[in-house]
């Protein structure tokens, strides 16, 4: 009979201990019940190359002895324990095993989980990663579910994960076979953050995106969803537009066919470059009923709200985002961050490009299904 595998013992990354190296220590917590057991220690001195250590070792706790160390990431700081002097080995082992349980039971998590399903993305995924690395707010994790039938993208994701502990790729079989709703649902279910940030596999978050979202969520703590403005552009740099009316005068203009006249284009500068930004509407009785005027990227759900409304519909291969937006509107308040925070790239071969008729057909039926609830919600919000 095959033996069951042994579980991972508590792991500590230790700085400032005279005993350098990798070794086991035995704790005597609850020794009177015969529960003595080992913990794993990785000891370095002084603190050098912390991010590499944290990425490769994946410790439960970080012990700093006589060292005043602080990470730039708050979720990492919550795992740090400062000691003034070197304890006996059994005391150190007891601290490690106890604090491993206490901290892992304290729901330590980053504020933002950026979630991304990938499909034959290849090198384009590096553009998405570059946008994350350049964020002014760095306490994030990136949860990816590779839905590719080959290994090319997976190899790139594994390499990123080995160099950055915040990158967390997953391969789930069977793959979805093109069911975008299921792929996004899987990615969100694996995410630990307080907020879930949707990013497509070849897109780009502008540098202040997460910082601006952090400020907005703190300003309006009762809201469960946020969205911003974006620029849609092609791989050659040409920018997409709907109609030819620019600026705020386009709002409500009879010749503006962008988002039924509620959406506008405007020029804005980011990183020394001018972009044609798209401002999608504030929620109103018309915009919430149509997929072409619903909130666009960047879209962000508070995780408890996302779970409460059921997340992305696993049985909707397309139009899943519209259905989720409607369900979110019925449940919570929304924040419109009126700033361009997202670059959405179009390679003429996206899910939207290849399924326009099916997406619009399903979206109209979703509107019909939720129409009365939308009406009642609008009445409720108007009270």
Predicted regions and their residues:
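N-proximal low-complexity "stem/linker" segments adjacent to membrane-targeting elements
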Residues: 2-7, 85-131
């Amino acid at each position: 009979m095959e033996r069951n595998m042994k579980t991972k013992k508590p792991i500590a990354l230790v700085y400032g201990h005279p005993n350098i190296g990798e070794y086991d220590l035995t704790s005597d917590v609850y020794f009177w019940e015969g529960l003595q057991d080992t913990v794993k220690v990785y000891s370095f001195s002084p603190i050098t190359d912390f991010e590499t250590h944290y990425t490769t070792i994946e410790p439960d706790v970080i012990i700093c002895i006589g060292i005043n160390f602080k990470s730039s990431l708050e979720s990492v700081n919550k795992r740090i324990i400062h000691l003034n002097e070197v304890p006996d080995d059994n005391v150190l082992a007891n601290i490690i095993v106890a604090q491993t349980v206490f901290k892992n039971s304290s729901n330590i998590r980053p504020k933002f989980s950026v979630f991304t399903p990938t499909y034959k993305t290849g090198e384009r995924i590096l553009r998405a990663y570059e946008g994350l690395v350049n964020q002014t707010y760095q306490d994030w994790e990136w949860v990816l579910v590779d839905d590719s039938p080959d290994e090319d993208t997976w190899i790139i994701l594994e390499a990123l994960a080995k160099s950055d502990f915040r990158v967390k790729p997953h391969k789930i079989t069977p793959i979805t076979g093109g069911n975008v709703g299921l792929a996004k649902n899987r990615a969100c279910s694996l995410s630990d953050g307080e907020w879930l940030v949707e990013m497509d596999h070849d897109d780009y978050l502008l540098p202040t995106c997460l910082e601006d979202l952090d400020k907005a969520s703190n300003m309006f703590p009762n809201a469960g969803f946020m969205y911003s403005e974006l620029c849609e552009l092609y791989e050659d740099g040409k920018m997409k537009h709907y109609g030819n009316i620019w600026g705020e005068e386009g709002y409500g203009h009879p010749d503006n066919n962008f988002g039924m006249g509620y959406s506008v284009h405007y020029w804005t500068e980011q990183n020394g470059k001018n972009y044609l930004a798209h401002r999608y509407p504030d929620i109103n009785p018309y915009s919430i009923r149509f997929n072409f005027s619903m909130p666009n990227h960047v879209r962000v759900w508070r995780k408890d709200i996302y779970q409460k409304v059921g997340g992305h519909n696993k049985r909707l291969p397309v139009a899943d985002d519209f259905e989720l937006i409607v369900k979110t509107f019925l449940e919570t308040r929304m924040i419109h961050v009126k700033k361009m925070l997202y670059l959405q790239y179009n390679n003429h071969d996206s899910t939207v490009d290849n399924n326009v008729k099916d997406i619009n057909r399903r979206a109209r039926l979703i509107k019909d299904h939720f129409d009365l609830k939308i009406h009642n919600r609008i009445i409720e919000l108007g009270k």
